[in-house]
Amino acid sequence: MFNWALEDRRLKIKAIVMDMDGTITRFNLDFVEARRRVLRDVEQMNLRTLDMTEQMSTYLLLKRLKENIDADKFDGIRKKFYGYVQEMEVRAAQDATLYPGALETLNLLRGWRLKIGIVTNNSRVGTELTLKRLRLDNFFDAVVTRDDCDEMKPDAGPVRKVLESLDIRPEDAILVGDSIIDIMAAKAAGLPSAGVPTGPFSGERLLQTEPDYLLNSVNDLPRLIEYLGTSMQ
């Protein structure tokens, strides 16, 4: 069943920007443990007064650090944190799987001659290992990871970068993701979004971030594209 969210507007879609884990792949990654490890490093620097916990989002934790310590210390902590996370991403990539029907959906969209890009907060190494395991390493027209941009979702930078790589205007694309940060990043970059409650967030929680559309899964995407209209001749 389709669940239309807030708007009923017709678009001519030429490209799809997708999140990876939680959207098309099952990817078990313990971000809490990575945050716990970096907070131990922070505590040794006598910075616990910043009131940070391992339950904070990665984005918020790094933002809080950046606002409260000098640039050199922040760069060092960020590199350590990304190192911790990359270790876990590499391990998790070995067990990554596609959601049922995701491959068929991707192939259908490719058959419609739509450009397809990935934008993820994962590392380049972890992302490439995951896509290679799933035999999708040469499938996407563009892949932007946290290593490719100074910003992370929910900031607009990574989305703008993938659109630039695809040579697509924001109004000619749609972003699909399972997280509130995907919806926020789409809004920041000026393109419509579709939420899928196949990750940590329920449909109700995603709707609070006001996506343009809410789908049951990525497998509903072809029907949405048909509804919106594509660039097919």
Please report, for each region that a protein language model flagged, where it lies by residue.
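Conserved phosphate-coupling serine/threonine residues in phosphotransfer and NTP-handling enzymes
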Residues: 120-122
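N-terminal helical cap/lid subdomain that shapes the substrate entry/recognition surface
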Residues: 1-100, 104-112, 128
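Asp-based, Mg2+/Mn2+-dependent phosphohydrolase catalytic module
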Residues: 1-16, 107-111, 124, 128-233
